[in-house]
Amino acid sequence: PAGPSYRITLRKRNLKQNNELQDISFNYVPGKDSADVLARELVEADLLDGCDLLLVAHNMSELISNPAARERVFPLNSPPAPGQVPVESELHGYAKVLIRLVGSPVP
């Protein structure tokens, strides 16, 4: 029997694109995927700074273990854009991970 699957979105500022907000979405299947592997793939695809890998993996993992929370906002290790002070509400120096159920268990 197939279990639930989730859609996870990492929302953060992209310094390479005029500091625009960027949503990176991917599917997550418990038992098949892991937060560590997904975060590493984001770094390898140059979508995430390597110094943020462990933070993103940890926050994804926390959200996966409690999907009812729906989202988590956390400070990044990578610095915000030059001259920009960290602002949590605007995700300057912060990132947000969101999760939603896309597939329910099939009996």
Which ranges hold each PLM region?
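Intrinsically disordered, low-complexity regulatory tails/linkers
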Residues: 1-107
